Amino acid sequence: MLARLLVGLIKLYQWTLSPLLGQRCRFYPTCSQYAVEAIQKHGAWRGAFFTICRLSKCHPWHDGGHDPVP
């Protein structure tokens, strides 16, 4: 239930705000898509943990690149 809510909120962000902000993520998949995949694969709590770890790497001093959900 919580996982579905989180995925729904992320998808809402992807459909509404993300197009206005433009492509900024230095990773593939994007951080929001990574969050969706992590939550769907690992559940709400563990997926959120993986997402927080990923977001902590999303800054100008990190090279980025391909970073799939474990």
Curated annotation (Swiss-Prot):
One Pfam family recorded for the sequence: YidD
UniProt KW Membrane keyword: yes
Coiled-coil residue spans: none
Keyword vocabulary terms for this entry: Cell inner membrane, Cell membrane, Membrane
Subcellular location: Cell inner membrane
GO terms for cellular component: plasma membrane
Membrane topology type: Peripheral membrane protein
Source taxon at top rank: Bacteria
Main localization (coarse): membrane
Keyword rRNA-binding: no
NCBIfam families per record: membrane protein insertion efficiency factor YidD
Function: Could be involved in insertion of integral membrane proteins into the membrane.
Family assignment from sequence similarity: Belongs to the UPF0161 family.
Protein name per Swiss-Prot or TrEMBL: Putative membrane protein insertion efficiency factor
Source organism (scientific name): Methylobacillus flagellatus (strain ATCC 51484 / DSM 6875 / VKM B-1610 / KT)
